[in-house]
């Protein structure tokens, strides 16, 4: 039998000037120190309003803050309006105002927005990363109904958009975030995106690029070689490549039945492009068993590279480490709502995707600048639980504002340390 007695006589939600997002001051103060609003001022909009109460920059800034805090629906705008901490520094606009904001975006808006994301990320990488590693990947954003530019994507067996993302491996930052139509091939736009990145990124011959077999393109190889970029790209499963790998093992008298998945054989051979240029194929091979019987031909897994210094195993291990970058994309989609785009018009969805991308980058810049030790590896959702969702009372008296946090908060020592670091920027 369910016990209905309670030690509480009444409950209500009329607690006064209380906020459940007290820890949001860390990120909001950090963004003020970065002068983010000034950067956003350069984004153009098709705005015919006369003496608007809210500028487009103000509304966009609110949407970025909202994304960082994990409020992903337009209806969540009411939470910001009613929150005594969120509405303390600036007037929060209504949900209807946000909806009309999206009517003023255009292709010029998204182009300039994208440039800002690339510029911020490249500036951080140039300052903090000595040997950048660029990981390119395509992903999927599921669509519903008749959303513009949505298409069936055979690889995912679903309708959706097909974004292209390029992360810098050490910093996790998105150097490029391109929302593409559902009909776009996985590597469409890769050279154009790299061109934009290389105008901002310091290149002293120390940049490395990794991509899966979708990026196995001769024009991409040539472009990267011309820009002194070392690349590691998975080779498509052409019969010719498998045959060449098997022949190399035969020539070296290797019995592939002596190698399994946990301990494969690593080998290499070269491809002559012209009289002066070669490319290197690195492969690993191992036996396959099916129904208790060994297959006649080994399983062969190849990458192509212009790196002739690493051993075959080192080159293969370096390529396979790119799998961690797929977790960065998962964080973008899951923790920053980049996997849900609900507008009918494509350009509006592109703005939402860029908001998620910028929020993702801002968090990781904040993480590497302010957070310490194990906190430098936590995902955004973990950060929100640990440092954002703190009960706080907002007290305004004699032109002063005091934030009175819960005394039961267990991470207060670390929080105060992070707060002081933000103030010192």
Segments (PLM) and residue ranges:
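Structural motif
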Residues: 18, 49-58, 294, 343-353
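Basic, amphipathic alpha-helical segments enriched in Lys/Arg and hydrophobic/aromatic residues
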Residues: 339-400
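Short amphipathic alpha-helical "interface-anchor" segments enriched in bulky aromatics
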Residues: 30, 77, 140, 312-351, ...
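Catalytic cores of alpha/beta
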Residues: 218-222
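Short, glycine-/Ser/Thr-/acidic-enriched flexible segments
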Residues: 139-141, 171, 180-182, 238, ...
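An anionic, glycine-rich sequence signature occurring as long contiguous blocks
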Residues: 2-7, 230-334, 414, 420-425
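Acidic/histidine-rich, metal-coordinating catalytic segments
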Residues: 137, 206-215
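Dynamic "connector" segments at or just before major functional cores
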Residues: 1-200, 224-227, 367, 390-425
């Amino acid at each position: 039998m369910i016990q209905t007695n309670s030690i509480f006589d009444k409950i209500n939600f009329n607690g006064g000037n209380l906020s459940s997002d007290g820890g949001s001051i860390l990120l909001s103060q950090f963004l003020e120190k970065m002068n983010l609003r000034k950067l956003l001022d350069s984004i153009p909009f098709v705005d015919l309003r006369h003496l608007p109460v809210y500028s487009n920059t103000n509304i966009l800034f609110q949407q970025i803050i909202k994304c960082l805090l994990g409020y992903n629906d337009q209806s969540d705008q009411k939470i910001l309006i009613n929150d005594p901490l969120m509405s303390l520094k600036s007037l929060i606009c209504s949900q209807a105002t946000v909806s009309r904001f999206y009517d003023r975006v255009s292709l010029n808006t998204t182009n300039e927005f994208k440039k800002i994301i690339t510029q911020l990320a490249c500036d951080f990488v140039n300052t903090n990363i000595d040997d950048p590693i660029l990981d390119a990947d395509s992903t999927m954003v599921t669509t519903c109904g008749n959303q513009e530019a949505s298409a069936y994507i055979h690889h995912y067996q679903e309708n959706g958009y097909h974004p292209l993302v390029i992360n810098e491996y050490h910093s996790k930052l998105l150097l490029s975030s391109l929302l593409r139509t559902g009909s776009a091939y996985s590597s469409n736009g890769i050279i154009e995106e790299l061109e934009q990145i290389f105008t901002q990124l310091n290149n002293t011959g120390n940049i490395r690029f990794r991509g899966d077999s979708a990026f196995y393109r001769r024009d991409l190889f040539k472009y990267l070689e011309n820009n002194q970029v070392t690349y590691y790209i998975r080779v498509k499963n052409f019969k010719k490549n498998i045959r060449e790998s098997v022949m190399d093992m035969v020539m070296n008298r290797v019995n592939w039945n002596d190698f399994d998945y946990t301990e494969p054989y690593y080998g290499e051979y070269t491809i002559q492009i012209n009289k002066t240029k070669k490319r290197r194929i690195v492969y690993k091979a191992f036996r396959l068993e099916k129904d208790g019987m060994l297959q006649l031909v080994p399983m062969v897994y190849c990458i192509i590279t212009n790196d002739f210094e690493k051993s075959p195993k080192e080159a293969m291990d370096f390529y396979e480490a790119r799998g961690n970058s797929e977790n960065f994309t998962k964080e973008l989609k899951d923790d920053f709502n980049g996997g849900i785009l609900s507008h009918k018009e494509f350009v509006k969805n592109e703005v939402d995707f860029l908001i998620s991308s910028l929020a993702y980058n801002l968090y990781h810049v904040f993480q590497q600048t302010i957070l310490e030790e194990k906190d430098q590896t936590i995902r955004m959702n973990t950060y929100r639980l640990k440092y954002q969702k703190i009960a706080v009372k907002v007290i305004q008296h004699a032109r002063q504002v005091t934030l009175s946090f819960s005394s039961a908060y267990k991470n207060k020592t670390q929080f105060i340390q992070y707060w002081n670091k933000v103030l010192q920027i």
